[in-house]
Structures are given as C-alpha cells and as structure tokens.
Regions:
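N-terminal Sec signal peptide cleavage junction
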Residues: 17-19
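Positively charged n-region of N-terminal signal peptides that target proteins for export
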Residues: 1-4
Length: 151
C-alpha cells in the first residue's frame, strides 16, 4: 500500500497541475468510444484517500467482456463513499491497453448521495470518461491516481 501511494503521489501532483491547466476534456467532440466500463467499489479518506473496486470492460472491437480490478490514491480528500460507475473508453487499441496508471483532478461532494464525471488518462493514451454515483459522506477537491489491472 505504501509503495502504491509513493509511486503514484509524485506523478499525480505533476499531472494535476497539467490537467488543471488544460480545462478541455481530453477527447475530441464526436469521438466514438472504443469500449465501455462498469465498476463498483468504495473510497475512504482522511487527507489521503484510498479507492478500490472491481469492474468489467466491454471492448467494442471484439465484442467481449474483460474483468478488471482497480485501486488508487487521492490527495486532499475526506470521507467515505460507496461507488458505482460507468464510462466510455477512448483510444483503446487492445484490451491490454486498459491496464495502467491513470490520473485525474476531481471535485465533488457526497452527502448521502452524489455523482460526478471525471476524465482519466493513462500512459498509453487510453481515456476513460467516468460517470459515478456515490453514497456516503465525502468532500474532495483532489488529485487522483488510479491503477487498473485486467484479471
């Protein structure tokens, strides 16, 4: 866990500055998704947060489903929440490209129920536009790093 936090923290802060400077979504208007994801999990935080979950990638190219797991850290985050999310995946040339480290800057409030949209991008150029529904109590204006691994 400690190794994950340290390995994601430095690039996370640097990417947070880059993402904050580029307010436009990293997907061209009218782009067609190359896949879709669904996942459920949770998040807890007291300054530094931890997120976990399991999900499924639907690859539009081969019309198959691939299970994955995710874990991640956030900075400037407080609270806890259950998360259900779905999203569109862009720039996916093969299912293996989903695996990797993703970064994003997010802001949100969950008081009993909430939701948000975030763009996550990995080192292979894969972008996930994630729509999440949350339940719990959580306040965040945070830099996030997430690691996704195909099972």
């Amino acid at each position: 866990m400690r190794k994950l936090i340290f390995s994601l923290a430095a690039p996370l802060l640097l990417s947070a500055v880059a993402v904050a400077d580029d307010a436009a979504p990293p997907v061209a208007p009218g782009a067609i998704p190359s896949g879709y994801v669904w996942y459920s999990g949770g998040s807890v935080a007291v300054g530094i947060g931890y997120t976990w979950g399991r999900g499924t990638l639907y690859n539009s190219k081969d019309q198959k489903q691939y299970p994955f797991k995710l874990s991640g850290v956030s900075i400037a985050d407080v609270g806890g929440a259950g998360i259900n999310a779905e999203g569109e995946v862009y720039n996916l040339t093969s299912p293996a490209d989903l695996s990797g480290n993703y970064s994003a800057v997010t802001a949100g409030v969950t008081i009993i129920e909430g939701g948000s949209v975030a763009y996550l991008k990995n080192e292979k150029g894969v972008v996930i536009k994630l729509h999440s529904q949350t339940g719990g109590l959580r306040f965040n204006l945070s830099a996030n790093g997430m690691h996704i691994t195909l099972k």
